[in-house]
Swiss-Prot record:
GO terms for cellular component: cytosol; small ribosomal subunit. The lineage of its organism: Bacteria, Pseudomonadati, Campylobacterota, Epsilonproteobacteria, Campylobacterales. Binds directly to 16S ribosomal RNA. Signal peptide: none annotated. The gene is rpsT. This is Small ribosomal subunit protein bS20. It comes from Campylobacter curvus (strain 525.92). One of its GO terms (molecular function) is small ribosomal subunit rRNA binding. Gene3D superfamilies: Ribosomal protein S20. PANTHER family: 30S RIBOSOMAL PROTEIN S20, SMALL RIBOSOMAL SUBUNIT PROTEIN BS20C. GO terms for biological process: translation. It comes from the Bacteria. Belongs to the bacterial ribosomal protein bS20 family. HAMAP family: Ribosomal_bS20. InterPro entries: Ribosomal_bS20, Ribosomal_bS20_sf.
Length: 89
């Protein structure tokens, strides 16, 4: 248990940040999973919609400081490549 006022505040902040990061991490996994499942099902329309949502969400995570800019770009790029393989086939 914290003995100083500043340590107590830090403990509270850590709990809040952990919860927030868990929410973002789960959301990121679910969004990515939706795109991958749509591609596996060979559903072009659903894959495009999921990719659009993923792109929007991932870039919003950058503005909130959860992801770095290059990490977000890489993730979106890989998902787009995956969807484009569906269009080519």
């Amino acid at each position: 248990m914290a003995n100083h006022k500043s340590a107590e505040k830090r403990a509270r902040q850590t709990i809040k940040r952990t919860e927030r990061n868990r929410f973002y991490r789960t959301r990121l996994k679910n969004i990515t999973k939706a795109v991958r499942e749509a591609v596996e099902a060979k559903d072009v329309n659903t894959a495009n919609e999921a990719l659009k949502l993923a792109n929007k969400s991932i870039h919003s995570f950058v503005s909130k400081g959860f992801l770095k800019k290059q990490t977000a770009a890489r993730r979106v790029s890989r998902l787009a490549q995956l969807v484009n393989t569906l269009k080519a086939a």
